[in-house]
A protein has these predicted regions:
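Charged, helix-prone or intrinsically disordered regulatory segments positioned adjacent to compact structured domains
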Residues: 1-74
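Charge-dense, extended regions
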Residues: 64-118
Length: 118
């Protein structure tokens, strides 16, 4: 499984500890996010989440996104990456209105500084 697909799987499972750890590993390794290969998965959700995360990480590292991300559309239904957004109205609204653009355009919702590190 490609690293971007591992990230997407952790996001889909809402396993934020694993997701943050994987992102930190890729960032510390000075990954060329623009060269991330397209996942070979047949799971449309994983493909959409992979594209969103690849674009987000590319953007945050001042790199162009991988070319394959342009071919990937949105999810069929909104997906909140934080479980608590389902029960906390203000958090849900924050995620819906301020989620990073690569995610929001694909109906993935998270807080505005999702996966940013100090």
């Amino acid at each position: 499984m490609e690293p971007i697909e591992q990230l997407a799987q952790a996001a889909l499972e809402q396993d934020h500890l694993k997701l943050r750890s994987l992102v930190q590993d890729l960032t510390h390794a000075k990954t060329d996010f623009s060269a991330l290969p397209r996942p070979s998965t047949t799971d449309a959700r994983l493909l959409v989440i992979s594209a969103a995360l690849a674009e987000l990480l590319s953007q945050r590292n001042n790199q162009p996104p991988p070319a394959w991300t342009k071919e990937i559309g949105a999810l069929k239904e909104p997906f909140f990456l934080l479980k608590s957004a389902a029960t906390m109205k203000h958090l849900r609204i924050l995620c819906e209105t301020q989620s990073p653009e690569p995610m929001r355009k694909r109906l993935l919702y998270a807080p505005p500084h999702f996966l940013e590190f100090a």
